[in-house]
Amino acid sequence: MSRPRFLPDNFTLALIATVLLATFLPCSGQTAVVFEWVTNIGIGLLFFLHGAKLSRQAIIAGMTHWRLHLLVFACTFVMFPLLGLALKPALSPMVTPELYLGILFLCALPATVQSSIAFTSLARGNVPAAVCSASVSSLLGVFLTPLLVKLLLGAEGETGNALDAIGKITLQLLVPFIAGQVLRRWIGAWVERNKPVLRYVDQGSILLVVYTAFSAAVIQGLWHEVPWLALLGLTVACCVILALALVLTTVLARRLGFSKEDEITIVFCGSKKSLATGVPMAKVLFATSAVGPMVLPLMLFHQIQLMVCAVLAQRYARRRDDAAAALAEAPSR
């Protein structure tokens, strides 16, 4: 029997297990140095494979729909940061100051690629446009996220020079991605054939970052500084932000006259945030001991968005099926 879509997937369970492992068996000293090196190699490999998997033809096919892309990018890089700032009076009492900074970091991140496309496809939306929007959003994030982080968190003294951050992210994330794109001509078919196996490389890289980040944070006293009540407040905060993002993207898509297929793409690409990009970026942008609290809101938001968007995608798909069935029956009446 298949697992209901609203239950956590295996990767989410692995994330939880990794956090627990870091809590009870954190790496430190020379072991932490070794893990740091392995993690850096894993991140480079992760983005190399992302570049090798991404079809240039699919991006070009979706590029002509510039109004849709502009709206998605505006939702990702303008609407979300404004929500994070506007909700500060409501969110700050619910979470610790460190977790609120993590929420602001979440709001500055690009859209996720794989799940945005998967949910758009499931809901019968404009898949080529989703591929283009989500992929370009991820690339824009290399440059825009450090600038947004500096603007949103700079006053708190949590970030360094934004240009230095862009340089580090370009070297660690964008260069491997471009290398993967360049070599796609020769290795693309092999990557496509081995997608199920290579998925473990993706997930393993993220788990490595989470383990090293939470190990450092635990050693610095993370769980003594984050009470359970703040974690409950963080859950509520993530639900509120996602709900507002879904409502606003839906309303904007309808008010601006987009088709139902385009609305689906805007909703799923404009309301999601990338764990695969966010965790490595946090490692570059923040001190190792600060990464844990920074990515905790993102990890929680990631699971909530998967559960909610799975249900929403199924509702969209059912409506499309019902409409098609009604249209097919119409001539016989």
From Swiss-Prot:
Stated family: To E.coli YfeH.
InterPro entries, sorted: Na+/solute_symporter_sf, Put_Na-Bile_cotransptr
UniProt cross-references to Pfam families, sorted A to Z: SBF_like
GO CC terms in record: plasma membrane
The protein's name in its UniProt record: Uncharacterized protein PA2026
Domain of life per record: Bacteria
Species whose genome carries this gene: Pseudomonas aeruginosa (strain ATCC 15692 / DSM 22644 / CIP 104116 / JCM 14847 / LMG 12228 / 1C / PRS 101 / PAO1)
Higher taxonomy: Bacteria, Pseudomonadati, Pseudomonadota, Gammaproteobacteria, Pseudomonadales
Cysteine-cysteine disulfides: none
